[in-house]
Amino acid sequence: MAKKLSKNESLNFKNEMLAKFDDYLTGLIEGEQKAKAEKISFWILDWINYLDREENFSPNKMLKYKRGSIVKVHLGFNVGSEEGGLHYAIVIDADNDLSNPVFTVIPLTSVKPHTDLDKLGKNQIFIGNEIYEKLTNKLKKLLSKLSSIQLPEATEEELAQFQNELAYAKRIKAEIDKMKTGSIALIGQVTTVSKLRIFDPRNRYGVLKGLRVSDD
């Protein structure tokens, strides 16, 4: 067990740690690794945000994430070959209770131009374009619904709902525009994470809400 520090010792330790951290980031920037320094810095800011939210976080206010659900989660800045950053992922819990503050996911990565699908590692599985196609179909259905609304005859409440759903459709379109059409499941990097790390979907207007991969 670590030695219990006095208040002054804690402050000194904090200052030493920050100085070392500053030196490390400065070294990265000056050593032509500016991008890495920025990723670490952004992750620290995100991590502080998670810690600030942690005390009042209630998973009961989130959605229920079923097996096969597609989510976007922040995996953090990790070491070595551990997957990190903001990633799509597949929920694999058989029955994750709404009150459960964590869930288990398989991270996904996109197919790159240089990726040879015939030479994937044994812990990688190509799952095709299913996520892209399902999100595209979701957008088509929403746009079809919106196009059927008779705006001149709509009430104020209906117009407000129309504006909300139109904004929702635009966010879905923006997500589709950023997506690659092929995904690879990194089954060797299954991980359990806090639902605090969920970027999307967190409510019924989440872009990925309702998206699930097929069982096969």
Locations of regions flagged by a protein language model:
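C-terminal terminal-subdomain/extension
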Residues: 1-50, 54-55, 63-66, 117-216
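Short, surface-exposed secondary-structure edge patches
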Residues: 60-64, 80, 94
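Loop/turn positions that initiate beta-strands
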Residues: 68-70
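Short, charged beta-turn/beta-strand-edge "cap" motif at the junction between a beta-strand
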Residues: 74-82, 96
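Short beta-strand-centered aromatic/proline hotspots
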Residues: 84-95
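Residues located in well-ordered beta-strands
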Residues: 88-90, 104, 186
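Short, conserved beta-turn/loop elements at beta-strand boundaries and strand-helix junctions
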Residues: 94-100, 111-112, 192
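Short solvent-exposed strand/turn elements
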Residues: 103-119
